[in-house]
């Protein structure tokens, strides 16, 4: 039995977000194929995701130096508890399903803030004399990525720092990232929206059966 963490990184409701619609198709098929697995849904835009800021970094250094957690300011304790809870939730999962849009050739800022909660030396990777070593080698992920243009291939593929960035950072910590599902090109061809979404949903069903 596997524990799946379904991470949604779009503020848009499902009826508006095409990638979220495709992700729901993926999850429905996955649950049908794996009824004994547990699925936990994390909607980032409905979640407190603390920024890795000076306050958190200072608290981390103070704790490493021996300061007691209870000696931190109450608001810092609260922020650190929220941060650590996201870390532990991520580490406890076996599989990850990320659904996220491409914004200005990158990922949503809240998704980047979330990434900072689990890419942590000593938890998801460690430094060695030979360089960084991944620690999450027994886990896997799939990325469901929406964009108005076409960036998965072709002349604009080198422009994007969305799907390639998230894929790279997950691989850096050892996670096996299977082929992504792209929901793309609708802004280029609005008349083909239904066709594009249907094709992506078909890929999602096939991918879910193998995930």
Swiss-Prot record:
GO molecular function, one term: oxidoreductase activity, acting on NAD(P)H as acceptor
Binding of FMN, residues: 10, 17-19
Family: Belongs to the azoreductase type 1 family.
UniProt keyword NAD present: yes
E.C. number(s) listed in UniProt: 1.6.5.-, 1.7.1.17
Signal peptide start and end residues: none
Subunit record text: Homodimer.
PANTHER family the record matches: FMN-DEPENDENT NADH-AZOREDUCTASE 1 (PTHR43741), FMN-DEPENDENT NADH:QUINONE OXIDOREDUCTASE (PTHR43741:SF7)
Biological source species: Listeria monocytogenes serotype 4b (strain F2365)
Cofactor requirement: FMN
Reactions catalysed, as given in the entry: 2 a quinone + NADH + H(+) = 2 a 1,4-benzosemiquinone + NAD(+); N,N-dimethyl-1,4-phenylenediamine + anthranilate + 2 NAD(+) = 2-(4-dimethylaminophenyl)diazenylbenzoate + 2 NADH + 2 H(+)
Protein's name according to its UniProt entry: FMN-dependent NADH:quinone oxidoreductase 2
């Amino acid at each position: 039995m596997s524990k799946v963490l379904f991470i949604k990184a779009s503020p848009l409701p499902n009826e508006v977000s095409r990638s979220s619609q495709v992700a729901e198709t993926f999850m429905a098929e996955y649950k049908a194929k794996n009824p004994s697995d547990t699925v936990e849904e994390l909607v980032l835009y409905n979640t407190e995701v603390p920024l890795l800021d000076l306050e958190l970094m200072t608290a981390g250094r103070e704790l490493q130096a021996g300061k007691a957690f209870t000696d931190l300011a109450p608001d810092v304790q609260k922020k650190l508890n929220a941060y650590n809870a996201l870390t532990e939730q991520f580490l406890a999962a076996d599989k990850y399903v990320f659904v996220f849009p491409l914004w200005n050739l990158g990922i949503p800022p809240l998704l980047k803030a979330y990434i900072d909660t689990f890419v942590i030396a000593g938890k998801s990777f460690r430094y060695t004399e030979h360089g960084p070593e991944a620690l999450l080698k027994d886990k896997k992920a799939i990325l469901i990525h929406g964009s108005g243009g076409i960036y998965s291939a072709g002349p604009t593929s080198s422009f994007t720092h969305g799907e390639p960035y998230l894929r790279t950072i997950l691989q850096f910590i050892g996670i096996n990232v299977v082929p992504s599902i792209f929901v793309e090109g609708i802004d280029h061809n609005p008349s083909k929206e239904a066709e594009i979404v249907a094709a992506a949903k078909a890929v999602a069903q096939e991918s879910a059966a193998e995930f």
